[in-house]
Curated annotation (Swiss-Prot):
Naturally occurring in which organism (per UniProt): Legionella micdadei (Tatlockia micdadei)
Protein name as catalogued: Co-chaperonin GroES
Chief subcellular location: cytoplasm
Gene3D superfamilies in alphabetical order: GroES chaperonin
Compartment(s): Cytoplasm
Amino acid sequence: MKIRPLHDRVVVRRMEEERTTAGGIVIPDSATEKPTRGEIIAVGPGKVLENGDVRALAVKVGDVVLFGKYSGTEVKISGQELVVMREDDIMGVIEK
């Protein structure tokens, strides 16, 4: 199954955070928070403006983004846990 987001929504796959500290200490699953960065796997066509025009999104498939831990709605599709959120929920794109 595939998801196609509408309007200014994007679908993000969370990226795993580092589970060891700089000193080599392993952090258990129970002590880690949900990752707040992920890779965009699908984008909607854009935001519909008041005059009816559609403004394209500033992000694209493959971008690694930073978002708030309470952003979007979690969904499970084809065994993958994904987050559907508005472009406004994205704080920034992490550049390589």
